[in-house]
């Protein structure tokens, strides 16, 4: 129903029988019109656009990200604003990053990545998106714990993370770019911590984590195996958190470790013991 939708999207807050707007929508509309007008007036001279909006001061970055996120809903807006602001060589790198942050923090960026996924790959920008998700696609909550210093809890947000996971898996980029393994593992581990996981995305993330564990095990046959613990611990944590999608693989994995511990050589025994 409408009330549930507004609550789930964070538009309203409820207290007992009363509801209120969670933020000033009129303020958002004013900024939306301001950015739209500045963009139209620049007529493709993007430096003019950014020089204009920078007059807002430091608040401009979050407002710009929100403006970008709001362009996700309609294809006309995605074509008019997001294509040029993502791919044009005339965009300053600092602002291109803000554009990417606005995209990945949006809950509605699925269509964008479906439409522009191939272009992102061709332009070599995929891991720019991965790094920005890993750094910025979070929501902070300050926790006050009795007689202790306040702590910040970071929760993954936005739909950029699952969209990129699908792209990495479908194009098998996780196999081709082993050098980027740490960033991909963090991406999947953060997704595993989300409450609103989707089975097909979780399955893709698990497949990549399983591949990296098996890859590290093969590597350890030729190299000093002690580093394998650091390499696979985050992968295994992600798999534990998504056990509904990795249960059979985990059973097989630990059965293999047990067998190696019982029947293997000294190196296999020590490696299996350390992993367990």
Where are these regions (language model features)?
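General structural signal for secondary-structure boundaries
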Residues: 1, 24-27, 91-93
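Short amphipathic alpha-helical interaction segments
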Residues: 1-9
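Short capping/hinge segments at domain boundaries that bridge a core fold to an adjacent linker or tail
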Residues: 13-48
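Extended amphipathic alpha-helical scaffold segments
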Residues: 15, 39-276
């Amino acid at each position: 129903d409408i009330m549930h939708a507004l609550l789930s999207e964070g538009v309203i807050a409820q207290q007992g029988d009363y509801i209120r707007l969670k933020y000033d929508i009129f303020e958002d509309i004013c900024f939306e019109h301001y950015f739209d007008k500045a963009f139209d007036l620049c007529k493709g001279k993007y430096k003019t656009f950014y020089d204009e909006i920078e007059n807002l001061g430091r608040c401009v970055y979050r407002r710009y990200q929100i403006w970008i996120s709001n362009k996700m809903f309609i294809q006309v807006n995605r074509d008019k604003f997001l294509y040029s602001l993502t791919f044009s060589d005339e965009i300053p790198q600092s602002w291109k990053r803000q554009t990417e942050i606005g995209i990945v923090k949006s809950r509605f960026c699925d269509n964008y990545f479906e439409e522009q996924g191939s272009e992102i790959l061709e332009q070599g920008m995929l891991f720019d998106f991965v790094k920005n998700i890993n750094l910025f696609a979070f929501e902070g909550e300050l926790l006050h714990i009795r007689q202790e210093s306040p702590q910040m809890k970071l929760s993954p947000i936005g739909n950029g993370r699952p969209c990129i996971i699908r792209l990495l898996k479908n194009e098998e980029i996780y196999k081709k770019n082993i050098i980027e393994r740490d960033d991909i593992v963090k991406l999947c581990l953060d997704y595993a911590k989300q409450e609103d996981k989707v089975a097909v995305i979780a399955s893709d993330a698990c497949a990549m984590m399983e591949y990296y564990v098996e890859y590290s095990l093969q590597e350890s046959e030729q190299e000093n195996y002690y580093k394998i613990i650091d390499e696979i611990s985050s992968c295994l944590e992600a798999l534990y958190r998504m056990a509904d999608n990795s249960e059979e693989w985990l059973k097989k994995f630990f059965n293999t470790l047990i067998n190696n511990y019982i029947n293997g050589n000294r190196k296999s025994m020590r490696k299996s013991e350390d992993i367990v």
